[in-house]
Amino acid sequence: MSALLMTKALRQLDPQKLAKEASCITELNKRFAVAKVGGKTLVLDTFSETLDALSFRDFENMYNNVDVMMGKSSSRLGKYWLYHANRRQYLDGITFQPGNVVAQSQYNLWSGFAVEPDDTLGCSLFLEHLKTVICSGSDLQNEYFLNWLALMVQHPGRLPEVAIGLLSGQGTGKGLFMQYLGSLFGRHYKHITDKNHLLGNFSGHLHDAVLVFADELSWTGNKSDAGILKALITEPTRFMEKKFADAIQVKNCTHLIFASNETWAIPAESTD
């Protein structure tokens, strides 16, 4: 079984436990939590890659077909969980603090790295590809990039305030390099191929991004793009906004890498 299939299997809730009074709350708590999101109180689906937020009514409707048996009587699972004293909840809202412990009353969007360190293994081929291909054999570029990557891994919550640009022809391994690098971060790695998904108003999909790969984005010379991009690279906070939901401010931990086959890869000015 692949790692992806194993992960999905582990993230499934047990239908039998959901139908029992003694286990249904604990089982639903694995996936759902009540939290303050902007000015609303909603139910977070923590298994969702985009952290879907449901209204109480929508959550109840989702589980209206499940009855919790309590002796000779029963209750609808959704309503039973919502009004239970032991439901999972974060009444002080959402925060994004990679690598940090937060208050129990807050939901930390950071879920950790997707892999565990193993001192018995090496990454010599990856490092060789980084130096000879990505950095064109330059010791200076290689050292700078390695330090940039080390900061991201050792302190994922620290904003580097510098973006990396990978410029080369097709077929040089930029995408393969990013696949391996992104696998360290799991859900905190975002592969973007549309400029609007990076700079558009609705950036909820970037809510928990640590590493963002902007792959062959097309720039039109719009000056506002440069301003938004600069803020994403340098500002300590940003707004997380989804359609039909209030925007909330979260910590900006974006480590941005661009890749392009074109000479003009990003809308940067000469002084940037």
Regions found by a protein language model. Give the residues of each.
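AAA+/SF3 P-loop NTPase mechanochemical coupling elements
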Residues: F202-H207, E241-A259
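P-loop NTPase catalytic core of nucleic-acid-dependent motor ATPases
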Residues: F96-F213, L217, D225-A226
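A Trp-anchored, charged/polar loop motif used as the substrate-binding/catalytic surface
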Residues: T132, E235-F239, A259
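N-terminal nucleic-acid engagement/recognition segments and initiation subdomains in replication
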Residues: M1-E143, L151, G204-L206, W264
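Conserved catalytic/switch belt of AAA+ P-loop NTPases
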Residues: G186, A226-I248
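Conserved nucleotide-binding/hydrolysis micro-motifs of P-loop NTPases
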Residues: S218-W219, N261-A265
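A short helix-turn-beta junction within AAA+ P-loop NTPase domains corresponding to the substrate/partner-engaging
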Residues: A268-D272
